[in-house]
Design a protein with these regions (language model features):
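Active-site acidic/histidine proton-transfer and metal-coordination neighborhood
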Residues: 69-199
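Short, basic/glycine-rich phosphate-binding loops at helix/coil junctions
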Residues: 63-64, 130-135, 232-236
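Active-site loop signature of alpha/beta-hydrolase-fold enzymes
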Residues: 57, 176, 207
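Flexible loop residues that form catalytic
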Residues: 32, 55, 103, 237, ...
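Histidine-acidic metal/acid-base catalytic patches
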Residues: 5-20, 35, 85-96, 109-110, ...
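Alpha-helix-loop-beta-strand connector modules within alpha/beta enzyme cores
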Residues: 46-58, 152-158, 162, 192-193, ...
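Hydrophobic faces of well-ordered beta-strands that scaffold small-molecule active sites
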Residues: 1, 27-29, 49-54, 98-100, ...
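N-terminal pre-domain/capping segments
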Residues: 1-85, 91-95, 120-126, 199, ...
Length: 292
């Protein structure tokens, strides 16, 4: 994400040089990267590409936002095809991992928006907030069934494609409550696949925000999936604003450090509006926290 800023618009080679100078040793290609930016990465030899975030390169407008959990079969199949395309690019650049958003419930859960307002008002522990959380969980349970079935089908097809290409799928936990999979759904999905083929990609900021809204227990969720973690997206949170540089927020990193397997890929997913000094300091900060 930090690569998506005007000074790197002409190519990501200069981004690679800045990243290397700050102490980073590899790159994840964001789903915001267009074909031109992707091709420029192929022409740099500064840092290896460890992972691709599907769909990469960024598809045409009509294909953006395709839902792997769609109940419409045409959309679901198109989303699978777009993700397999990313796997082909992963093979091309020698990346081992493809990070996947497995889709979402089509209906919005307005209760989550209300919880965000409660948080901003300092009322997240109020009776009204608790009632809103209960309603959010009830509505999600009522709506998720057909979408989870579609997501399972998509994952089966993607796992077959990944196995044929020698890459691994990392299922990312998402920011929105309507997104699939939840921690419980992730455990259910992963049970069908070997750890080296499909695993969990832990996004620290997304879990932190969900925890601050009271929608889940952060430590319980992470501990339940720790053994299946293939990689991470590391970023901090200010209030409910995620993708801050580690150290530029209020996240508790201690429980994360205890749960992360040593072999899990550590990827920094930092917003392009964070100052370069924070990018330079993030590695040292997380090393002191025991993450690196």
């Amino acid at each position: 994400m930090w690569a998506q800023q005007p000074r790197f618009a002409e190519g990501l080679g200069p981004f690679s040089q800045v990243a290397q100078g700050a102490g980073y040793v590899g790159i994840e290609v964001s789903h915001l990267t267009d074909l031109g930016g992707f091709e420029s990465l192929l022409n740099q030899s500064v840092l290896p590409v460890h992972s691709l975030h599907a769909p990469t390169p960024r598809p045409a407008a009509a294909a953006r936002g395709l839902n792997l959990a769609a109940t419409d079969e045409d959309e679901r199949a198109a989303a699978v095809g777009s993700t397999v395309r990313t796997m082909d690019y992963a093979v091309r650049v020698g990346a081992r991992f493809v990070v996947v958003h497995l889709g979402h419930i089509s209906e919005r859960l307005d209760e989550e928006d209300q919880l965000r307002r409660f948080f901003q008002q300092g009322r997240i522990e109020s009776d009204e907030a608790r009632a809103t959380r209960d309603q959010a969980h009830r509505r999600r349970r009522e709506l998720v069934g057909p979408h989870l079935t579609a997501a399972q089908r998509s994952l089966a097809e993607l796992a077959e494609a990944a196995s044929a290409r020698g890459v691994a799928i990392g299922l990312e936990n998402r920011l929105g409550f309507r997104e699939i999979p939840s921690p419980e759904e992730t455990a259910l999905l992963l049970a069908d696949y070997p750890p080296g083929l499909v695993g969990y990609w832990h996004d620290t900021g997304h879990l932190e925000v969900q925890g601050r809204l009271g929608l889940l227990d952060r430590q319980e969720a992470l501990d339940s999936l720790g053994a299946r973690i293939l990689g991470t997206h590391l970023h901090d949170v200010q209030g409910l604003r995620d993708h801050r540089a580690p150290g530029n927020g209020e996240s508790d990193w201690a429980y994360i450090a205890r749960a992360l397997p040593p072999a899990a890929v550590r990827t920094f997913e930092i917003s392009g509006d964070e100052p370069e000094t924070f990018i330079q300091g993030a590695i040292g900060f997380l090393a002191r926290c025991g993450i690196l």
